[in-house]
């Protein structure tokens, strides 16, 4: 009986700690993110802007989506210049398949991106973190002799003192060369 009581108390304590941590994250000031310093943010931006994606393409479905999420998170930082937003946008487009790229020109994409970033900044919003589903939950399918993989990502977005989530499902398509890595990205 005492053993069961200890387990129940331990579970209750862990649940209270989880709720308290969520409350802490949801109510801390937006300009002080405990998970990231300004130096880390600047080095991340430098890395993302200068990375040679074409020669060093991510090897797995999860890595492609993770790189795209890191680029997206960097867009919405308040101190990112318009020049760096354009560089990040070009980096993100490298991850898009040709079909997705052809839906809008690079200039149209960058214009829409800047408009979206402006809305986020006006709402005092930024992506504080993201979470990609595990590789075990990635769904692989074949359609018209092409291989596809679907994976989900959740962005945690801070607007002022509020924390909300935004889910995105990505479908990646294996390229025609038949290489092991997936080289195309399409967001739903």
Name these PLM-found stretches.
Residues 1-46:
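Amphipathic, hydrophobic N-terminal targeting peptides for secretion and organelle import
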Residues 43-122:
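Core segments of small alpha/beta cavity-forming domains
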Residues 112-160:
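Surface-exposed, charged secondary-structure patches
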Residues 138, 167-174:
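Hydrophobic/aromatic beta-strand elements that line small-molecule binding cavities or substrate pockets
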Residues 144, 174-176:
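A generic beta-sheet turn/junction motif
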Residues 162-165:
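Short glycine/proline-enriched turns and hinge-like loops at secondary-structure junctions
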Residues 177-182:
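Tryptophan-centered short beta-strand motifs
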Residues 183-188:
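Conserved small/polar residues in nucleotide/adenosyl-binding loops
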């Amino acid at each position: 009986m005492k053993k069961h009581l200890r387990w129940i108390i331990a579970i209750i304590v862990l649940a209270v700690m989880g709720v308290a941590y969520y409350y802490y994250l949801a109510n801390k000031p937006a300009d002080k993110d405990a998970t990231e310093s300004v130096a880390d943010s600047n080095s991340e931006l430098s890395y993302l802007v200068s990375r040679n994606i074409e020669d060093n393409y991510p090897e797995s479905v999860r890595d492609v989506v993770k790189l795209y999420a890191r680029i997206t998170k960097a867009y919405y930082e308040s101190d990112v210049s318009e020049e760096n937003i354009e560089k990040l946008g070009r980096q993100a487009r490298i991850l898009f398949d040709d079909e997705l790229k052809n839906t809008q020109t690079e200039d149209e994409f960058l214009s829409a991106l800047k408009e979206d970033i402006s809305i986020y900044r006006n709402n005092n919003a930024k992506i504080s973190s993201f979470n990609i589903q595990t590789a075990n939950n990635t769904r692989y399918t074949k359609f018209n002799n092409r291989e596809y993989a679907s994976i989900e990502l959740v962005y945690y977005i801070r607007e002022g003192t509020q924390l909300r989530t935004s889910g995105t499902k990505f479908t990646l398509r294996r390229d025609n060369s038949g290489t092991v890595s997936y080289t195309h990205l399409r967001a739903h």
